Amino acid sequence: MSSSFQTIALIGKHKNPGIVTPLSSLARYLQSRNLTVLLDNLTAASMDEDSYPAVAMEEIGSRADLAIVLGGDGTMLNIARKLAPFNVPLVGINQGRLGFLTDLSIVTMQQTLGAILEGRYITEQRMLLYAEVARSNVTTFGGLALNDVAVNRGIGGNMIEFEVRINDEYVCLLRSDGLIVATPTGSTAYALSAGGPILHPSLDLVALVPVSPHTLSNRPIVVGPDAAVEILMQRTAVARVHFDSHSHFDLEENDKVMVRRSPHRVTLLHPSDHSYYRMLREKLGWSGLPRNPT
């Protein structure tokens, strides 16, 4: 059966020797199906592989019909942000531990990928956030986030103080260790550990989750996808804004962090038997079996 995916990019966790054997095996498998295989530059360098074209991420974005990512959720987050502007579908393969984004097992990857290449898969669209930092009314930093944009105290031990506005309307003055602005994808990450709600990934919603607030009545709130969230730094010694915990920018008093929904989306492909609720049970350790199994 012919596949709608003809050019496949393989991307692995960088500087991880454990990716070499499975990625080489996967590349040979894809080539045996008469598909064109691309490696991103850093993956090719880690594999010491010259049998396949090694290209920059921008070229993967312009040429690939599908990107297969081998690693953990952190690797997937990084690649998803880079490829989001190109709308390249992503498949995530974990290295033994099930991830929220990397749900294919490395043990059965060829069989599962074979089904996906033949059109048996579930497509899922995930929203992204875009945030900018303004200092003296000049934008000094910006970036995408698939999980969350988080303002936190830095290496110092003091709480930070900031004002929160939504769509130019004042919400509150918050004294806490920080604030997490999370997507549904990020609702099962840092935001969950801070007491935030779990949002189904099919929803376009944003959760605002305080981190250790000084006033216990400061609770998480959920807002619509078109909400423009502004965080205005007040008295703060050391604070940072983090994008998916990968990149960060140091904040100063009177800096403004502006968070909005990005026009870009991430497309994930899952096996046809994928179940979000089963994944929640397995990842979060929910116990118990149904009393009346169907």
Curated annotation (Swiss-Prot):
Residues binding NAD(+) are: D73, G74, N147, D148, R175, D177, T188, A189, Y190, A191, L192, S193
Catalytic activity as recorded in UniProt: NAD(+) + ATP = ADP + NADP(+) + H(+)
Q: Which SUPFAM superfamilies match?
A: NAD kinase/diacylglycerol kinase-like (SSF111331)
The entry's keywords:
ATP-binding, Cytoplasm, Kinase, NAD, NADP, Nucleotide-binding, Transferase
Q: What is its EC number?
A: 2.7.1.23
Q: What class of enzyme is it?
A: transferase
Q: Keyword Protease on this protein?
A: no
Task: Look up the domain of life of the source.
Answer: Bacteria
One GO biological process term is: NADP biosynthetic process
- Record localization: Cytoplasm
What cofactor does its activity depend on? a divalent metal cation
Family membership: Belongs to the NAD kinase family.
Mind telling me what this protein is named? NAD kinase
> What organism is this sequence from?
Nitrosospira multiformis (strain ATCC 25196 / NCIMB 11849 / C 71)
